[in-house]
């Protein structure tokens, strides 16, 4: 897993195709596609020289099933997100528990519901919980430490930090800081939050929650456990 593999032409082309899927009628994708070769060459050079800088987000709200602030990255940044996930997501995915169902190939909502119903038929009790303001509160220091356990290439870590930094404070108005015993000034002021809408945010959410998943399975001994993003259930 090397940084040069990320900006290789084949990977960038694959990333562009994924980013454009279902978006070809939208202006940002159409503008990029009009000069796609030039756009990818420019992006490749920026990544290779490490002068790539993420652009600003376009924000809007959805109201189903509840009000949420969505942050859409510029199209070229979405290409970079796909290029990064093409490279590192399979490595992390192999480390996830089988019963983590969000934003994973072969999983999804229907599979999660099927598994939930199977557990419900098998067990008498269930504890269902969710994480309040999961994306707005997500601690970058905790996330980067977890990523760095697997990703050792300093250039890849540089790119990850660039993408993470671009989303700092995007959701600051959505989250009231919660303090825990032992928190100091450094912990309180650490960067937090992942923009809802980024491919990387969905992936990094699973990376962030993976130690918790394994804690429930191994330390608590709860084999009948499943999670979908920030919602999870334990059966007994």
Question: What is each model feature region?
Answer:
Residues 22-30, 55-81, 95-107, 127, ...:
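Short, conserved non-catalytic motifs in the polymerase core
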Residues 78, 82, 86, 90, ...:
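Short, residue-level hotspots on alpha-helical faces of the histone-fold
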Residues 1-41:
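Non-catalytic, polymerase-adjacent accessory regions of viral genome-replication enzymes
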Residues 1, 85-139:
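Active-site-proximal segment of RNA-dependent polymerases
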